């Protein structure tokens, strides 16, 4: 594999507007070939998406999804830049897909990691630091392990970091980036609420994630 220089990453960022990590991945996937990396980013819908992400998105749609049987319901607000895009089939399908994703992810509480309150991160850190498997490790090693575990745990709580139920090879964040590239507007998932019938009442649980994924697959067929 060719060595990927910072200069090459910078050049790719300037040409595509993609994020640094996306550029590094594109170059690694294409053995340092700049043109192939650009094409790879375009195929993934990442190129140019980052450039649009700073623009104001004040239009959009509040979408809903009720799972079969009425046991789980979701409301989600997804913003775009214009009413024209908000009324389009592709944007509305994106909103519905995101709502179905939320229904399938009972552990998700936030849109992105930056939305997680500091006290939750501190609580998770305290839990990890107290685990028995770290008791005999040096302090600096413990800190590194804990940082990695906390990062993983916080991502489990966020919508954008989840594997997309219709295509687990991409994340929800990548799905949104693809839509930004396709529709030519900034798109932001702003907030959501997930309702569960009888929440807080002790009862037998079923695999909602599998059910929603199956329903999504059926809708495509």
Curated annotation (Swiss-Prot):
Keywords: Cytoplasm, Elongation factor, Protein biosynthesis. InterPro entries: EF-Ts_dimer_sf, Transl_elong_EFTs/EF1B, Transl_elong_EFTs/EF1B_dimer, Transl_elong_Ts_CS, UBA-like_sf. GO terms for cellular component: cytoplasm. GO terms for molecular function: translation elongation factor activity. Residues 82-85 are annotated as: Involved in Mg(2+) ion dislocation from EF-Tu. Coiled coil: none annotated. It is found in: Cytoplasm. It holds the Pfam family EF_TS. SUPFAM superfamilies: Elongation factor Ts (EF-Ts), dimerisation domain, UBA-like. Associates with the EF-Tu.GDP complex and induces the exchange of GDP to GTP. It remains bound to the aminoacyl-tRNA.EF-Tu.GTP complex up to the GTP hydrolysis stage on the ribosome. Belongs to the EF-Ts family. This is Elongation factor Ts.
């Amino acid at each position: 594999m060719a060595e990927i220089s910072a200069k090459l990453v910078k050049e790719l960022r300037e040409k595509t507007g993609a994020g640094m990590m996306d550029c590094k991945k594109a170059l690694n996937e294409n053995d340092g070939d700049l043109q192939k990396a650009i094409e790879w980013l375009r195929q993934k819908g990442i190129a140019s998406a980052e450039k649009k992400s700073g623009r104001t998105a004040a239009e959009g749609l509040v979408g809903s999804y009720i799972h079969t049987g009425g046991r789980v319901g979701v409301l989600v607000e997804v913003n775009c830049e214009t009413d024209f895009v908000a009324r389009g089939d592709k944007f509305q399908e994106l909103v519905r897909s995101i709502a179905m994703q939320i229904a399938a992810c009972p552990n998700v509480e936030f849109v992105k990691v930056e939305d997680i309150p500091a006290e939750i991160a501190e609580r998770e850190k305290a839990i990890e630091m107290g685990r028995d498997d770290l008791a005999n490790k040096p302090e600096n090693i413990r800190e590194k392990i804990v940082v990695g575990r906390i990062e993983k745990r916080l991502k489990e709580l966020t919508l954008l970091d989840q594997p997309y139920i219709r295509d687990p090879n991409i994340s929800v964040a990548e799905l949104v980036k693809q839509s930004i590239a396709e529709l030519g507007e900034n798109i932001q998932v702003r907030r959501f609420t997930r309702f569960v019938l009888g929440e807080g009442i002790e009862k037998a649980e079923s695999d909602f994630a599998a059910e929603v994924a199956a329903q999504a697959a059926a809708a495509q067929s």
